[in-house]
Every structure is written in structure tokens, then in C-alpha cells.
């Protein structure tokens, strides 16, 4: 794994999960079910957890929703899922926590938006109630500031001061600074109200990639709180994936960011779990964490007019993801497995040798055979109509042989403890 220098932060414990610079970057997601439907919400949390989400946020926006949070927690516990639940509060959080104390106890973390808690003294009182409730229940809090719901009184105060200055800044720069000030001032208030520093996580979300990078660089330089990364709205499909990757990878490479969420707009028919998979793939391709064996495959060219290698690459990746629910327990360390599926002789043998297991399928005009390489050595040559089945059997046998109870992996002729990989 990559040993990037992380920005030093407090360590925030959220049930069995630690968020901070001494822990791996944590992936979280959010449900889109009606929280008042406890059964549907619990089932979606299960799906997100199965996909690899380590914390899940749920909307708590009404008495009906708040009254079901404890039931959702019970349903998850009954299914054997200890996934921490984050309550997303806006506008009326203090009232819901007061009327439904079991809701506050069942949640593992509260998300509070300073921009819509309320105005003036009344807003301060609401904020104070939520913070004190979190402290009494020993819960963590994410103070999450959003570009679209910034505290307008703070924004106006800072805009007025900027206009009165001898060298006024562009309004958008003042707005970015207001986001940061809102988060930091709210955290300071929370500490004064009795919430320990190691119970606070901050976020300042915007929708533009360059703005997010600028804001988080500045925020990270001015506090020691763990930071939650994500665009407010990344968008749909490839645009959302690219925008999230572009923003988060820059910050993560600089050691900024302790928990992430990929806010994709779901396409019709696409699974909610896609945002979890994208988050995992960002961290894994950067070498920051390993979640599932990865498949390296060539993009194809005129030498690979057959679609066989493309189909095999897809089949192998799907097979590995499906097996991980079992392998993760039986074969610790298997998530670091690297499999290559290549389409012709140009790069096929070389890439296959560099992978733990690789197969080089024949390109156009090449001999219809597919050599398989294991730990850099040519092991067998496959041919015929059952190449996919035979190759997956080799992968299965490799996993059983090299990972498991002894906690060791044979790699390039050496035996290496899994924890050192």
C-alpha cells in the first residue's frame, strides 16, 4: 500500500470505526429510501454494507423518520450488521432529538449543518441542544457546511467587511472563506459546549472540482479535525465519477481527507451501491487501500478484433466481486490479488507476468492459445471453448493455496506475511 504522508488529525471513534490520520480513509454512503420505512432502509443499508460501505448516512427529517431510527438499528443488528448509522439533520434536528431520544441513542454520529440550524439566538440554542445531546450520548458529530446552504448572516458580515476593505477580494473568494470560517467557528462553539475535539469531523462541500480542492487545502491547514471529502453534487454517470475522482484524488494525494462519499446521481435502474464501488476504486487505484482483487485489462485495438478478452475481463471482475463476501473471511489479504486479462501478444505476456495471475489471449491472426502466468512463471496454456471456466478455476485454486489460515502469501518465490503487504 501507498505510504503517503497524511495530514495529522485527531482520531474520532465511531463505534468500531476510527476516522483520522492514524486510520485508513473510510468509505461512507447514504440511503435514498424513506427513513420512515424501516424495513426498506435497513435492507438498503445492508446492500451498501455488503458493497463495502463502512458507515451509512440516513435522512432524519420528520417525526416519522426519527421514530424509526431505533428500529432500523435493531433490524441491522438482527441481520448481523454493525454498520454505524449517521443521522442527517437539517432545520429541525433539535426538535426530533428532543421528541425521540431513542433516535439520538441509536445513531453513531450526527451530521449538523450550521447553515440551516436557525438564525440568531434561537439558532444558537438549537445548535447547542444538538451538540449537548451528542455529548451526553457520547456520539461523534460532523459539522457539514454546504455551499448551497451557507449561513447567510455570516456570509453577509464577511461580504460587508470585504467591501469596506482597501483591497476587496472577488465575491466567490469571500464565499469560500465563509465556508471555512463557518466550519471552524461551529467546531469552536461545539468544544465550548462540551463536545470533545476527538468527537468532531468537518466538511465544506461545494460542487466544482477546483473550488473543493482550494477550500479543503485551506481548511486542512487551519485545524486538526478529520475531514470528510465529497462534492455536494457530483452528477450522473461518467461525469459524476470523473468529477469526484478528479477532486478527491488530488486531495488524497496531498494527505488531505479521512472519510469520503461519492455523491453520484443514480441513473435509472443503476444500483445505489455504485457510489461505494467508485469510492473503493479511487482508494485502491491510488494504492491507499485494498478492497477487492483488481483486474488489469488492455483497452483493445486493431489487433484484438475479438471480444473474447473483453468478455473474460468482465467475467473475471464480476466473479471476484461476487466471491469477496466469502473470501474476505476465509482468505485474509486476498483483496490485494492482481489479475491480468490481456488481448494480444504485444503486452499480454509482460503484463501477465507482472500480475499474480495473468492470461494472454490471442489477438487477430495469432495462434489460438492462451498462456496463463502465475507469480511471473508460465503455468499452463489454455485453448478451446472453456478458457473462461478453466481460468477462473485457476484463480480459485490460487486463492485457496496462497491465502488463508496461515496468513501467508507466496509471492515471487518468497513467503511474505499478509500484514506486511
Swiss-Prot record:
Cofactors demanded by this protein: [4Fe-4S] cluster
Annotated cofactor note: Binds 1 [4Fe-4S] cluster.
Coiled-coil intervals: none
Range of residues in the leader sequence: none
Entry-linked InterPro entries: Dihydropteroate_synth-like_sf (IPR011005), IspG_bac (IPR016425), IspG_bac-typ (IPR004588), NO2/SO3_Rdtase_4Fe4S_sf (IPR045854)
Catalyzed reactions: (2E)-4-hydroxy-3-methylbut-2-enyl diphosphate + oxidized [flavodoxin] + H2O + 2 H(+) = 2-C-methyl-D-erythritol 2,4-cyclic diphosphate + reduced [flavodoxin]
Protein family membership: Belongs to the IspG family.
UniProt function note: Converts 2C-methyl-D-erythritol 2,4-cyclodiphosphate (ME-2,4cPP) into 1-hydroxy-2-methyl-2-(E)-butenyl 4-diphosphate.
Name listed for the protein in its UniProt record: 4-hydroxy-3-methylbut-2-en-1-yl diphosphate synthase (flavodoxin)
Organism encoding this protein: Neisseria meningitidis serogroup B (strain ATCC BAA-335 / MC58)
Amino acid at each position: 500500500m501507498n505510504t503517503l504522508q497524511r495530514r495529522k488529525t485527531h482520531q474520532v471513534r465511531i463505534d468500531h470505526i476510527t476516522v483520522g490520520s492514524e486510520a485508513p480513509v473510510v468509505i461512507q454512503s447514504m440511503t435514498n429510501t424513506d427513513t420512515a420505512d424501516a424495513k426498506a432502509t435497513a435492507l438498503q443499508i445492508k446492500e451498501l454494507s455488503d458493497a463495502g460501505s463502512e458507515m451509512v448516512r440516513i435522512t432524519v427529517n420528520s417525526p416519522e423518520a426519527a421514530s424509526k431510527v431505533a428500529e432500523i438499528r435493531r433490524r441491522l443488528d438482527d441481520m448481523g450488521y454493525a454498520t454505524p448509522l449517521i443521522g442527517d439533520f437539517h432545520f429541525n434536528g433539535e426538535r426530533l432529538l428532543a421528541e425521540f431520544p431513542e433516535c439520538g441513542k441509536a445513531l453513531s454520529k450526527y451530521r449538523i449543518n450550521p447553515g440551516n440550524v436557525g438564525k440568531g439566538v434561537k439558532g444558537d440554542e438549537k445548535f447547542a441542544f444538538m451538540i449537548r445531546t451528542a455529548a451526553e450520548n457520547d456520539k461523534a458529530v460532523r459539522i457539514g457546511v454546504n455551499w448551497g446552504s451557507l449561513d447567510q448572516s455570516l456570509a453577509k458580515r464577511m461580504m460587508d467587511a470585504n467591501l469596506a476593505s482597501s483591497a476587496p477580494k472577488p465575491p466567490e473568494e469571500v464565499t469560500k472563506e465563509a465556508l471555512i470560517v463557518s466550519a471552524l467557528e461551529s467546531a469552536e462553539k461545539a468544544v465550548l459546549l462540551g463536545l470533545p475535539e476527538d468527537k468532531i469531523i468537518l466538511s465544506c462541500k461545494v460542487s466544482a472540482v477546483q473550488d473543493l480542492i482550494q477550500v479543503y487545502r485551506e481548511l486542512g491547514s487551519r485545524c486538526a479535525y478529520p475531514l470528510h471529502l465529497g462534492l455536494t453534487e457530483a452528477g450522473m454517470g461518467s461525469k459524476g465519477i470523473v468529477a469526484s475522482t478528479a477532486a478527491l484524488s488530488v486531495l488524497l494525494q496531498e494527505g488531505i481527507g479521512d472519510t469520503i462519499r461519492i455523491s453520484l446521481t443514480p441513473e435509472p435502474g443503476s444500483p445505489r451501491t455504485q457510489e461505494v464501488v467508485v469510492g473503493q476504486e479511487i482508494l485502491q487505484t491510488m494504492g491507499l487501500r485494498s478492497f477487492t482483487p483488481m483486474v488489469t485489462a488492455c483497452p483493445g485495438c486493431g489487433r484484438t478484433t475479438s471480444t473474447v478478452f473483453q468478455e473474460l475481463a468482465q467475467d473475471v471482475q464480476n466473479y471476484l466481486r461476487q466471491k469477496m463476501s466469502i473470501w474476505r473471511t476465509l482468505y485474509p489479504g486476498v483483496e490485494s490479488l492482481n489479475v491480468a486479462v490481456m488481448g494480444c501478444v504485444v503486452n499480454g505476456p509482460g503484463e501477465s507476468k507482472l500480475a499474480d495471475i495473468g492470461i494472454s489471449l490471442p489477438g487477430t491472426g495469432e495462434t489460438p492459445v492462451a498462456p496463463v502466468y502465475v507469480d511471473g512463471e508460465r503455468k499452463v496454456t489454455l485453448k478451446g471453448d472453456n478458457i473462461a471456466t478453466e481460468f477462473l478455476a485457476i484463480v480459485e485454486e490460487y486463492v485457496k493455496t496462497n491465502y488463508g489460515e496461515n496468513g501467508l502469501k507466496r509471492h515471487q518465490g518468497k513467503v511474505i506475511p499478509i500484514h506486511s503487504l
